[in-house]
Amino acid sequence: MRALTSVALDALADGAAARGGPLPHGGPDEVAARTRALISPVLPEEGVGAQDALYDVVRAAAQGAADPSDPRCAAHLHCPPLAMAAAADLAASALNPSMDSWDQAPAAAVIEEAVTAELARVVYPEAEAADAIVTSGGTESNLVALLLARERAQARGERTVQVLVGENAHHSVRRAAWILGLPTPITVDCRAGRMLPAALDRALASLGGAPALVVATAGTTDEGLIDPLPQLAEVAAGFGAELHVDAAYGGPLLFSRDLAPLLHGIEQAVSVTYDLHKLGWQPVAAGVLAVRDRTSLGALSLRADYLNADDDTEAGLPDLLGRSIRTSRRPDVLKIATTLRALGREGVGGLVEHCVDTARRFAESVDRHPALRRRDGDAGISTVLFRPLAADALVDEAGDEAGDALVAAIRRELLAEGRAVLGRAVAEDHDGVRRLWLKATLLHPRATADDLRPLLELVAERARSLAEPQPATAGDAVAATLPGQQGAGLETVSV
């Protein structure tokens, strides 16, 4: 194992060196061709041996990877994992416990129980019956939250439950309602990217007292905005509706004593989604669903004689099958436990604060840049939307489609060249028109605003070259490198 691990680390380094940036150059077709060449044949008549196969496959993956440890990779809620978390994940793979029965995961089950109790207390510090389960991420957490709401309604003799979501809600909520056979969710109006309490009041009033679940968002995907949770909770309670908060992005703000007040009111929700593979720096997957009352998780319980026979449970063997909608389940909790124990609440909170502060400083850099402008309003949790002034000039000359086309072209060209990975979002501008923006989602726990400024120069230079074609004069000199980091395990994994 040690020898193979060394091979894998060498392959990661060699692949990253060959890539040379945050993303492989050439676009989808070239990347696919290079990757296939490096791993072929996938199923030879005679194998090449463990070390050669491992090196070839890992090097191919690294050479063709999007590297979130590079500050210029800032498109998505896609964090660079902490080295200690990646190392713990290696141990999880080596031990290979399956979390569906005690006889497959004796110690891992105890670790999960201890960790989920703490993760529940992060959300519900005053609730004596709070609990949490580990999920594969926000999509699964939201699905389970809606499932539990449906089961609670049916236990009260109701046929179903009506879900209400903001225009800003993550698509997984509507998909969960579809999967569960629930009525099509009612969409509640938003203003400036946040759900309007008055609009929620009108929507709930129209239901005439039918059972309802309001899904608020704490950290929208496009902008990192937080719904007005106290007001939404008050409106929901006035109609006897339940509240679920999708805090897949924003939930880890609760680790910071300074930032936790941004989520005031979240404790009034019956359930809360939050991810640790976003603002938590865990390898995917590391999701959490916290519930205010653990008895609601009873809806997940079932019997399978080979896993949790009645007599085994009565004899004292723990029943793990009701801790997930999955059966076979890897011990994702090991990396979470390692990180929480290593950093403590203050350490995790400090990293969250760093990302939030970096986003604020990055937004200030955009505001000072003569060729760029930021979307009006405060930056989201750690998300900044901006676009080149050259796009606005095209709007004046040829309309909104021309301006948006320039923004899209800048993003795609930088992707194809492997220079930068920026996201895209459609959001309302100061004049009420919805326009396309470049999106920087800043989750690097060590990067600074100075490390990120080259992104702005890349965008500005490309906007100039596309709006007014001329020979390229910039590009190669704008790559930023992070300063060396100190502290074993606190560094992120660079691929």
Where in this protein do the model-derived segments appear?
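N-terminal entrance/gating region of PLP-dependent enzymes' catalytic architecture
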Residues: 1-129, 418-424, 441-443, 447, ...
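Conserved PLP-binding active-site segment of the aspartate aminotransferase-like
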Residues: 382-395, 400, 419-454
